Amino acid sequence: MNNNYYGSPLSPEELQHQMHQHQQQQQQQQQQQQQQQQQQQQQQQQQQQQHQHQQQQKTNQHRNAGMMNTPPTTNQGNSTIHASDVTMSGGSDSLDEIIQQNLDEMHRRRSVPQPYGGQTRRLSMFDYANPNDGFSDYQLDNMSGNYGDMTGGMGMSGHSSPYAGQNIMAMSDHSGGYSHMSPNVMGNMMTYPNLNMYHSPPIENPYSSAGLDTIRTDFSMDMNMDSGSVSAASVHPTPGLNKQDDEMMTMEQGFGGGDDANASHQAQQNMGGLTPAMTPAMTPAMTPGVSNFAQGMATPVSQDAASTPATTFQSPSLSATTQTIRIGPPPPPSVTNAPTPAPFTSTPSGGGASQTKSIYSKSGFDMLRALWYVASRKDPKLKLGAVDMSCAFVVCDVTLNDCPIIYVSDNFQNLTGYSRHEIVGRNCRFLQAPDGNVEAGTKREFVENNAVYTLKKTIAEGQEIQQSLINYRKGGKPFLNLLTMIPIPWDTEEIRYFIGFQIDLVECPDAIIGQEGNGPMQVNYTHSDIGQYIWTPPTQKQLEPADGQTLGVDDVSTLLQQCNSKGVASDWHKQSWDKMLLENADDVVHVLSLKGLFLYLSPACKKVLEYDASDLVGTSLSSICHPSDIVPVTRELKEAQQHTPVNIVFRIRRKNSGYTWFESHGTLFNEQGKGRKCIILVGRKRPVFALHRKDLELNGGIGDSEIWTKVSTSGMFLFVSSNVRSLLDLLPENLQGTSMQDLMRKESRAEFGRTIEKARKGKIASCKHEVQNKRGQVLQAYTTFYPGDGGEGQRPTFLLAQTKLLKASSRTLAPATVTVKNMSPGGVPLSPMKGIQTDSDSNTLMGGMSKSGSSDSTGAMVSARSSAGPGQDAALDADNIFDELKTTRCTSWQYELRQMEKVNRMLAEELAQLLSNKKKRKRRKGGGNMVRDCANCHTRNTPEWRRGPSGNRDLCNSCGLRWAKQTGRVSPRTSSRGGNGDSMSKKSNSPSHSSPLHREVGNDSPSTTTATKNSPSLRGSSTTAPGTITTDSGPAVASSASGTGSTTIATSANSAASTVNALGPPATGPSGGSPAQHLPPHLQGTHLNAQAMQRVHQHKQHQQHQQQHQQQHQQQHQQQHQQLQQHQFNPPQSQPLLEGGSGFRGSGMEMTSIREEMGEHQQGLSV
């Protein structure tokens, strides 16, 4: 036997099988022993008769010697005396009693196996008269000790020969073999290390481990109770005993090595000199039928009666090493309260964790240990029935991400049709769909969703569960699976693995053993023979060498293995490599002549175009090209030049599936020396834009202030519309190839990632996020993703993104004193103008395709995939906005593009004419006698009108410069028209002409304040007056009266919208109310602080006091205006729809003249 063998625990099935064999062997041995006993009994009877005969002869001799002088008697008297002598000598005992006495003596003598010398051993211990009897002095009295004084002088001469017996310790019940032996004798018997029977002091191993045979893995101890044998993985050799009896132990006593080896152990068999520290300590009783061995024969054994059937061994010879082995067989099915066994832990002398090498397991997973944990788990709620390696089961690791499968049985592969390589590493949910693709967290379509949820919830709680549900084999064939999930620990007390047992209840209806009420079913998961389910894929005609496929799979694999990028390849390898790429490419590599004839097609033609290469070679491209695309395609081929790329997009007719968009990209090749020219192209199917009109209208339609982009499914820009220049001040070509997340802040990227994940699945998804323009300003945006090339619910190859810039009031800015709830008019998006498109929009709709017929690599109406989705044709036939891209349209896309450009140009001209007519009507209607004056100093002559606190040009040049310096915004501007500067306002960089966000962020402080002193002008006013009011939409002016005198501020109608002096007409009459009720519309609903509210109230009282003075000077102003009107031009018109403007009632000027505003306001304000 091999002394270095490290065995592993056997499965319960194997243990039961071995135990059954051992029992059969024991029965055979018992029969042999009975035969031997019968022979021995016969010999004993003969010896008994001889002994009686000898005693009779001796008695007769003594009698004859004492009766020499006595007269002889009759033969009858002699016969009577002989009979009495026989009776006195025990001749009256029956044969059964004699046999029982011999058996008892034999059991008592052999309770402690030991070698004997060569002298004759008499089977009867009552042969006291024999002088050669070595047991004549055997003491039958009760023992007074435990042989503590026994020394090495105990006679054990001779050699012990090895016995080849079975490694089974079969001990019977205590009442069977020791019925006639005193209990005191049994209690004081000398303990042997391998006899786990009764209380005994510890004893050290008297044998050295060197030279001893190791105990085999099937070594077990049978206590004849209710459990089977146990395997033990011995780490060190263990000598055994091999003397066999009916009800005695059976151990191997062969030390191996012959007489020399036995002689070397003879000196170690002395039982004396044992110290208490080396004696084994054993617990009161053994848990039924379990005893494990490791380290050596005499290792101390300790076992707790209340613990699991596992034994801990520790070798006394290894002082610095502690090894704990806890293994044991599972309890019988009737035992349900056995605790889960502790894991196997081993610490070698080096201190590190030992790693057991997997010699026999290819997967490296200890399945026997896992099944043992299943059988010996704590408080089992499900009865599995019989389990062996023929079951279909998998093992999942719950500590890894998504609980992947780490082990799969052979019958599970046969049951599902999937191979081991297709199963390991995946979650078990792949069986819940016919195609094997099921995403986590999604609603199940082919399986009962509630059953799956219950299964998931129970597994998350770490509980056992039995669930029947529909699963699908490879290829989509369903079967009714009865699934049982059992959690088991491993190295710690926590749950590590889940073992799932499966069985097809339709094919194996007899597997259900029984069911207790409405509880779980007891199932026999074992299979006698299960046929392998083999999935047969749809038959497809394989490419033959005639189609150009000359390299087989083995050749391609060899080339890939021999590929070395650093080394120098030979010409043969280069040619083979090029040939491999050509024949295995997904794209159709084709060669065309200048006239459009096919000269070569790669084998991918069969997959993409459904034609065999031989069917198209020699034919013209026009035979499979759409009739409307023949002219532009032929023109592109004839105009091809060397070193110039050729890119043609046209509709090609497939053999069975109709027309599809096809793009070919290549160049002209000129063969040197022969003058032959051809065009080498690489073509692939290209899905085009497909967007339903109803989907677009449900999400807000098309507006002006929005950006349309084509993005990949990962969020990378493939094409950007041209209006990104005016909205974000960025160039489209700089954005192409970058990610949309680069324009966002980190806070918005997480939500954006979740939204694009939904869009990747074919759903229309929207999210609100933030974008940054070129200056780094943060703008609020709202992006909606549409499936680019198919309907909703189908996985697209690219996405269409509609990004709308939101209103200024929703932007994130620094806090101000007054928070305006109402949205600023400048941030309201314009109403969409349906049917109006510009030239840039037309290029956007066509995906950036150039007018000459070619397209950009990132902006063409192409995607990153090689084939369109299953719904491409259906999406194009539906209510598609891109109706011009239908494959069945009778015109070419170049013609449609030219027509669209023409229509857009006509619409733009018509729009310009309408706007011009609107300006003329406003100018004719607004012709009045009002003359513009400065809102601060009231001057009417100035070289340029500048912007003031209201955002309008209501300040003269000097006052406007002071205001700009005070607020830190100096706008250098030259005027080409004296007195009127509004003509340059459209191209101005003034904060009022920029976006409201620019005006707000441009402020150095959270609020912009303006103070007015007692003087009628703003000269020298550099401090901030108390009572300042600030809004998110722009600065405001606060005025205060301090000291003596009065402050007079005469404002025109242009400044009445944002200054406090023009907050509204005085409340005259019973409907008067709080000052907040008379705020202009753009300040309605605002929250003013207490100081500002008090200042407004004081201002209204001041207005009522000065109303009388205003009425007196009103006539004088009118006369002066009439006189000046004859010498000056009409005041310039305000810019229509001024972005961010805050004119009267919070709106822009909207091409309304100053006189109209004055007419609505009825009167100016002066103090």
From Swiss-Prot:
GO terms for biological process: regulation of DNA-templated transcription. Induction: By blue light. It comes from the Eukaryota. Residues 381-452, 574-644, 693-763 form the PAS domain. The modification S-4a-FMN cysteine is found at residue 428. GO terms for molecular function: photoreceptor activity; sequence-specific DNA binding; zinc ion binding. Residues 1-91, 307-355, 849-872, 918-952, 966-1047, 1060-1167 are annotated as: Disordered. It holds the Pfam family GATA. The keyword Zinc-finger applies. FMN binds covalently to cysteine after exposure to blue light and is reversed in the dark. Signal peptide: none annotated. One of its GO terms (cellular component) is nucleus. Residues 469-508, 650-691 form the PAC domain. InterPro entries: PAC (IPR001610), PAS (IPR000014), PAS-like_dom_sf (IPR035965), PAS_fold_3 (IPR013655), Znf_GATA (IPR000679), Znf_NHR/GATA (IPR013088). Keywords: Activator, Chromophore, DNA-binding, Flavoprotein, FMN, Metal-binding, Nucleus, Photoreceptor protein, Receptor, Repeat, Sensory transduction, Transcription, Transcription regulation, Zinc, Zinc-finger. Gene3D superfamilies: Erythroid Transcription Factor GATA-1, subunit A (3.30.50.10), PAS domain (3.30.450.20). Residues 70-91, 307-325, 968-977, 1004-1033 have a biased composition (Polar residues). CDD domains: PAS, ZnF_GATA. A zinc finger (GATA-type) spans 934-959. Residues 21-57, 335-348, 849-861, 986-995, 1036-1047, 1104-1128 have a biased composition (Low complexity). May function as a transcription factor involved in light regulation. Binds and affects blue light regulation of the al-3 gene. Wc-1 and wc-2 proteins interact via homologous PAS domains, bind to promoters of light regulated genes such as frq, and activate transcription. Heterodimer of wc-1 and wc-2. The glutamine-rich domain might function in activating gene expression. This is White collar 1 protein. It comes from Neurospora crassa (strain ATCC 24698 / 74-OR23-1A / CBS 708.71 / DSM 1257 / FGSC 987).
